[in-house]
């Protein structure tokens, strides 16, 4: 998953959000420490460039997309973006109440970006954000330090994505600052729970409970007005049980949650795939945001496309695995979400393999098992912000329709903070599973396992010019049929070719970027594909669909072939031949003569077409073919 890239997309997407000014309503006996409403930081001590020279104004906050703060200003280390570093120290004050209350937001990193409380020069409390720009309540119990000298310290020593901390309205009180919760109870009567979404509304944390068990949690733009669109959560497994839906209490939240209802089909189902900006050929999700393709696998006649999905909004977040299948790589059927955020974090990118030898030991009745290996993204999500990234597995016994998460997760603990995106393949000569994993700063690691549960590191290397979303596969060389080579790719399609003995990858080429555009990212290829085909799909990360109930799209499937050339080996990428299945009526114009005042025009009643042209530049003769899709 994409801390570096997605923060840019997030900023671009949320800038239209409605800012919500929180009135903290201090009690008469509360003691204000600072709410940063002045033009300067006053007697606070500044170090570095992260916090600028003054509190950040409401106008700048609105541009950034911050949508919950107190008053007109706050302290933020995002003044110079993620790259800024620095420290902001308050003047000394005396502890005179039981609690120090404040608002906090920004990145989650207890080591490098946080708010701390010092007592007599020694740190005694520390809090961090949770990778959200929305400010949340925080409260420190300081009763044991009554009467002692204290100092608040804001620290930002991170230059990575989400490398900033926001804070506002520090005050002392004998009352703990806590969110007031509104709860809606409802009986599950049908297959889907319908949830209203208001674009640009404040993003609220929404938790769904059955009894004392939280079964789902998500961040949703909940507004009190008429919703812009509806999203759904499949609740068929809970029919007959009572749900308790909780979110921060406000008139808008109450109005939105009271609109939630159950139905046998999704609300607005009649509008699916009919929106004016909906791509006609590229895969898009019915509702919500998508990014990385995940778990690309062919199994029993179906091409499975799992993908990073926000089922509850058109901005990045709530990372869940969506699922679609195709029998021909041209027509896709969306099946719904399969892996949801859990106690280890949101579900970031990964891969799916066919466990033909039942190495995981989950096979039943002879049915082949599909196993997903993915990143549990601790550090993201309100309830898992205190965790770090780890690698987990899940399995399916019914062709990917339903999944069970492994009870022993994670199967690979944290190595570095944002290690992620495991790609797994079977290595026949050693009879073991191989995992490639992104670590940090263009560095990757290779692991092996006999059973998908127990992993041993065997190699580390760097891919200059790329990071995250690794892929690793063996291919025949087209013009040297007896030769097979291993190919390693990074997210932006930069690749290396070399040899692999099951333990170490030895490169034989320099890094080459296969796709030079800016709309082809998080590249992944299919495992277990028939006829030894190597089919690749990418996230088209340069697209955007304003005011639509969906966002982002996938590339066409491409077929890769490996070729020997004078300088070594190169990959060739072409759209799969199956796209011809989309073609309809064909229009051909030949021997066209193009003149400055004689432009060729025609009317075609078609929403999409494939254009093929040929030009003879010297004679300005042209041929034009249009094929209806």
Q: Where in the sequence are the language-model features?
A:
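Surface loop/turn signatures of beta-propeller and other carbohydrate-active proteins
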Residues: 24-28, 125-128, 133, 176-178, ...
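Extracellular glycan-recognition surfaces and repeat-rich motifs
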Residues: 40-74
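Hydrophobic core segments of beta-strands in well-ordered, beta-rich domains
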Residues: 101-103, 152-154, 195-196, 245-246, ...
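Extracellular carbohydrate recognition and processing domains
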Residues: 117-165, 178, 196, 210-239
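Beta-rich accessory regions
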Residues: 179-196, 201-212, 237, 243-249, ...
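Conserved small/polar residues in nucleotide/adenosyl-binding loops
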Residues: 374, 627-629
